[in-house]
Amino acid sequence: MEIILSHKICLDPTYKQAEYFRQACGIARFTWNWALEEWKRQYDLGLKPKALELKKQFNALKPIDFPWMYEVTKYASQQPFIHLQTAFNRFFQGLGAYPRFNKKGHHDSFYIGNDHIKLDSKHIKLPKLGWVRMREALRFSGKVISATISSQANKWFVSLHVKLDQMPKSCESTAKRGC
């Protein structure tokens, strides 16, 4: 049985690292808003937009129109397309509301894939940034499959998604509520 758990850990970034986080969140927000606007435009023309097609169009524009995006991890400008596709799938299935534009400071976050993450006790290594101090060590042993960096009340957090082979003993009694 495959189990995936998340562990949200408070980060202790330097000023430079926090600036990087703000920039990556801004790029993720900009990309989402660009993709949503383009989706609406194409849909109004009678087309059936797809996230991968929009991503290809965006990547063709990026070197010329948005070169500043290369200053942070590539995931900041890739993952919003996947999230938008999921949001529209949920909308068309009647499971969610129509996707809306993102505003600065409202659920700021960005995703990082496991191929760009390294952990060392109370530190996480992020692409184009280096080692960032975590306030606690990861509680679960397993394969880290992704991370999401987010901001809440002027604090930065990393939510690590870990694939486990079995449920940790500390979680067995609270499995219904989550660990």
Where are these regions (language model features)?
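Nucleic-acid substrate recognition interfaces
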Residues: 1-179
